[in-house]
Amino acid sequence: MRSSVLSLHPDRLLPADPGTRAIARRLYAQVATLPIISPHGHTDPAWFATNAPFANATELLLVPDHYVFRMLYSQGIDLDALGIPRADGTRAAVDPRAAWRVFAEHYTLLRGTPSALWLNHVFHDVFDLRIRLDAGTADHYYDHITAALQTPAFLPRALFERFNIEVIATTESPLDRLQHHAAIAASGWQGRVVTAYRPDPVVDPEHEQFAGALQQFGALTGEDVLSWDGYLRAHRQRRAFFAAHGATSTDHGHPSAATADLSPVQAQRLFDTVVRGEATPEQAELFRAQVLTEMAAMSLDDGLVMQLHPGCFRNHNRQLFEQYGRDKGADIPMRTDYVHALKPLLDRHGNDPRLRLIVFTLDETSYSRELAPLAGHYPSLLLGPAWWFHDAPEGMWRFREQTLASAGFYNTVGFNDDTRAFLSIPARHDVARRVDSAFLAKLVAEHRLEEDEATEVAIDLAYRLPKQAYNL
C-alpha cells in the first residue's frame, strides 16, 4: 500500500467556526515565533555538555518517551522488543532498526493522541519528512533521521538554538554533582541550561533507594543526616549548590499534596523512626508532609520557587517495575485533596508573597473545586499548567475553562513541556500556543475580551508568565 502524504495543516487546533478561527489566527501569529521558556523538564544535561551526536532514531525518539512506549505496551508489545533498558541496566539484544520497525508498524495506535501531534511535528518540521510513518516507510524514516543526526545541524546545541530555546531547566537529584551544568557554564556556549532541585530520593522513606541515598547525602554534605537538624542543614547546603549552578526552582513528586507543621521535638521523633527503617505508610506520609513545609521555609530564605507534582500512583505495575524500573509508563493518576492537604503549609507560610508554590494536579476534578479558588486567594500559590495525562489539547482547554473564573490567567504560570523528548519541545509549546489562542479567540468572539487584551494575554501565557513565575 502506498504511504500517504505527511502534512501539518496551518489551522490545526484552531476553532472550526470561521469567524473565531480568524481571531485565533491573528492571536497565534503574535506568539508563534516567541522564544521558548522551558522552566521544568527532564532532558539530559549531558547532551548539551558534550554536544555529541544522538545515536539513532530509536535512541532519540522512542527509548526515552514513555508516552509512546506505554501505548505500545498496552497492546501487548514487549518492551524488550523496543530496546527499553531494564532495571539492572542491561538490554535485550535487539537491533535499533528492528525496534523502530515495530514502532512504525504500530504507529496507528497513536492516532488522535498528543504524541501523534508532537511526533508528526518533529518528523515534518525538524526532519523535513513528507510521507507518513508506517511499516512501509519505517526504514526510510530510520535511515533519514539517523543520517541527519550525524550532521552538525542536528547536534544538541545546534538544535537548542534552532528551536529558539531561551532557557531550559533540567531536574536533578540532590546527590547529583552537576558536572554537566558546570561543563556547559565553562564551555563558553551561550545556551542557558539550568538545573532544579528534586530531593525525592532523600525525602520519601518509601523510595526504594532511600536508605542508600540518605547515606550518600550525608557523605556528600558532611552533615549528620541521621539527626533532624543535620538533615535540614544538608538540604540547605545542596540547595545553595544547585542555586550556584543556575537553579531557580525545586520540584517535589509526592503521592499526595499532604503538608504538616510539627514541632521540632515531634519532627525529630518522627525522623528517628524513619532512619531506623521502621516508618509505617502513615508515618512515611507524615514525614514527606513535614519536609514539604520545611522546603517552603527554606524557599523563603533562598528564593527557590517550589513545584509540587502530587497525585500519581507510581509504578502501578509491580512486575514491570521489578523488570524495568521507574518511569516506564505505569504511573496512574489518583484523586487528590488540596484544601485540607495544603492547609498546614499555607497556615505557616501561605500569606507571605515571597513564597512561590506552583501546584500541579493529575486530578482534573480539583481544578474548579479546590485549586483555582486556592490560587485565587493565597499570594504564595500559583497553578501549574495541565500536566502529563492532561497536556493534550482537550486537557489544556479544560484547564482554562475550569480555572479562569476563580484564578484568572495571572495566577497560572504559562506552559511547561515537562519532557524527556528533546525534539518534541517546539511541538509541545506550539500546541499550547495554538490552544490558548483558540481559547482566547472564543472569549473575544463572545465579547468577553477585546482583541488587544487577548493578544497581551497570549504573549503573557507563552513567554512572560513562565519567566516571571520561575525567576528566569
UniProtKB/Swiss-Prot annotation:
UniProt pathway annotation: Carbohydrate metabolism; pentose and glucuronate interconversion
Keywords: Isomerase
GO BP of this protein: D-galacturonate catabolic process; D-glucuronate catabolic process
GO molecular function: glucuronate isomerase activity
Family listed: Belongs to the metallo-dependent hydrolases superfamily. Uronate isomerase family.
Entry-linked Pfam families: UxaC
EC number: 5.3.1.12
Designated name of the protein: Uronate isomerase
Reaction equations catalysed: D-glucuronate = D-fructuronate; aldehydo-D-galacturonate = keto-D-tagaturonate
HAMAP family found in the cross-reference section: UxaC
NCBIfam families cross-referenced by the UniProt entry: PRK02925.1 (NF002794)
Superkingdom to which the source organism belongs: Bacteria
Segments traversing the membrane: none
